[in-house]
């Protein structure tokens, strides 16, 4: 279920919760949960490896430029990879607002009626964004406000039954993101989120 639902905007966590309830399965072991998150990271890395590689290189260049003055670099718009790194950092910030409520939100996953209702909400969000959303914004034209709002949508998607990818893609399209960029940004934005969640589980 995790493998099929993770890359579809249908809330893998919501479906896992319902699967546990209807089949009377015990709570997922913490180690197994960590492995599921790690597998998700690997899958995103495989699909977007070129983007990730460019951003990692640019991230270390950014760090290096704080200590070493770069000669020959002209002022102006930053490279696309550098801009994407900055957008992902900004988009991840709203997650810190929901951290204090993590246990309470996780408890909602044990209520099948609530989870089912959130799955319906996800469906409505996807329908509306597909019908009315979309624009021409890309990584070069997306604003700070845009990515922060997408980050807020990602924070809201910690609620069981709300699809993280579906919610962030829909938010991006509602803000005028071009469809392909909305999908790409959503999955790249999942990397720091899933990595952070995995580290929290380990700790």
For the regions a language model picked out, list residue spans one by one.
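Multi-pass membrane proteins that catalyze or facilitate reactions on polyprenyl-/lipid-phosphate substrates
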Residues: 1-203
